[in-house]
UniProtKB/Swiss-Prot annotation:
Its main location: membrane. Degrades abnormal exported proteins and responsible for the propeptide processing of a natural pro-protein and for the maturation of a native protein. It also plays a prominent role in stress (heat shock, ethanol, puromycin and NaCl) resistance during active exponential growth. It is found in: Cell membrane. This is Serine protease Do-like HtrA. The gene is htrA. GO terms for biological process: proteolysis. Residues 305-401 form the PDZ domain.
Length: 413
């Protein structure tokens, strides 16, 4: 099971196959080793890590770009680490703790008593979880940091522990759950070094890489592990139903590494560490399989987040569930034909949305988009995300046992 740190819901076990299922799981105090973030019940004080301040690297542009410099065999990984160590930080997710006990909170939640909501809002900020981040740009008086979305998910405030041991407040510039990326900003006066992105298109299996981050939290900030690129472009399916192309590496990725840097021998960030494979779909324990978001995708997303604060993606304007996820007993109640095995059941159609305007109805089953088979939510997203908002796609639905084709103009999310 590929895991990061986004939620702890158990996924149904599937028989072993070629597909890798990526699930998100918060690494909590009762959790197992699942990947990039470390969560604590409470922490009053952060341990300040030691680090050497590097010469300041100033970037005047308001967006990031991929470097044209390529990795050479003669480069040492020690030199590569020195090129990024001042730019890799610990990201601290802070939440306000309610004054009421866990039992009282549960009772109030179940029976609608929100009298303690104000005490929660005014409660003391405490460390909920930790991850890593990379300072990649200095512009307009701000330092910009890329991290994973799940590292800051649900936070009431965010702090950053710099490589020199100083802790500063950070603001969330933008975040995107689909790619699991987020951008933070801090005052530029605290930035002593920025990392440079390499070109992930030219990666090859067997290349030496290092992972830099804060495994187990800020106590082990600036930890570096070494490995190779196991696969430069591995396609996996995440728990949110999206297909994602990632870099596979055997460099050790531990809780707290999420959002940290995967670095080549030229000292360039070629990926943002995000997930690790804890076990296969049949429950077999797995070692040495971790995944990073390719730098070229990171650059595209962070530039958009800095510019707009969010990522706009095309959608149909429907709520769906894969037929494979509908229990047999419910299929007859939903009037799904017994011979229809694969597809996406439409549970809800947004009023005046693109699908509604095209004539799609609740109860329809999407079987194809642009002639391509749609078997699950991941395949639907994969097709839709290859288009832009405003594009028109041909959607084939099964309605009462008959295929119906409709033209749908994609709307934005």
């Amino acid at each position: 099971m590929v895991e990061n740190q986004n939620n702890n819901q158990n996924q149904p076990r599937k028989k072993s196959g070629n597909k890798i299922i990526a699930t998100a799981a918060i690494f909590g105090v009762v959790g197992g080793l699942v990947g990039g973030g470390v969560s604590y019940y409470a922490m009053d004080q952060m341990n300040n890590g030691q680090g050497n301040g590097a010469a300041q690297i100033s970037i005047s542009s308001s967006s990031s770009k991929v470097s044209e410099k390529s990795a050479k065999n003669g480069g040492t990984m020690t030199a590569a680490y020195n090129d990024v160590k001042g730019a890799v930080v610990s990201v601290i997710n802070l939440k306000r703790q309610s004054a009421s006990s866990g039992t009282d909170s549960l009772y109030n939640s179940l029976f609608g008593d929100d009298s303690d909501s104000s005490s929660s809002k005014n409660g003391k900020l405490e460390t909920y979880s930790e991850g890593s981040g990379v300072v990649y740009m200095k512009s307009n008086g701000k330092g910009y940091i890329v991290t994973n979305n799940h590292v800051i998910s649900g936070s009431d405030a965010v702090q950053v522990l710099l490589a020199n041991g100083k802790t500063v407040n950070a603001k969330v510039v933008g975040k995107d759950s689909t790619t699991d990326l987020a951008v933070l900003s801090i005052d530029a006066k605290y930035v002593t070094q920025t990392a440079q992105f390499g070109d992930s298109k030219h990666l090859e299996a067997g290349q030496t890489v290092i992972a830099v981050g804060s495994p187990l939290g800020s106590e082990y900030a600036s930890t570096v592990t070494q490995g190779i690129i196991s696969a430069p472009a591995r396609t996996i399916s995440t728990s949110s139903g999206n297909q994602q192309t990632v870099i596979q590496t055997d460099a050790a990725i531990n809780p707290g590494n999420s959002g940290g840097a995967l670095v080549n021998s030229a000292g360039q960030v070629i990926g943002i560490n995000s997930m690790k494979l804890a076990q296969s779909s049949d429950g077999t324990s797995v070692e040495g399989m971790a995944f990073a978001i390719p730098s070229n995708e990171v650059v595209t997303i962070v530039n958009e987040l800095v510019k707009k604060g969010k990522i706009t993606r095309p959608q149909l304007g429907v709520r769906v569930i894969a037929l494979q996820g509908i229990p047999e007993g419910y299929r007859s109640r939903l009037k799904i034909k017994s011979n229809l095995k694969n597809g996406i059941y439409i549970a809800f159609v947004s009023r005046n949305g693109s699908a509604a305007n095209a004539g799609i109805k609740s109860g329809d089953v999407i079987t194809k988009v642009d002639g391509k088979k749609v078997e699950d939510v991941a395949s639907l997203h994969s097709i839709l995300y290859s288009h832009k908002v405003g594009d028109t796609v041909n959607v084939t639905v099964n309605r009462n046992g008959k295929d119906v084709d409709m033209k749908v103009k994609l709307e934005g999310n």
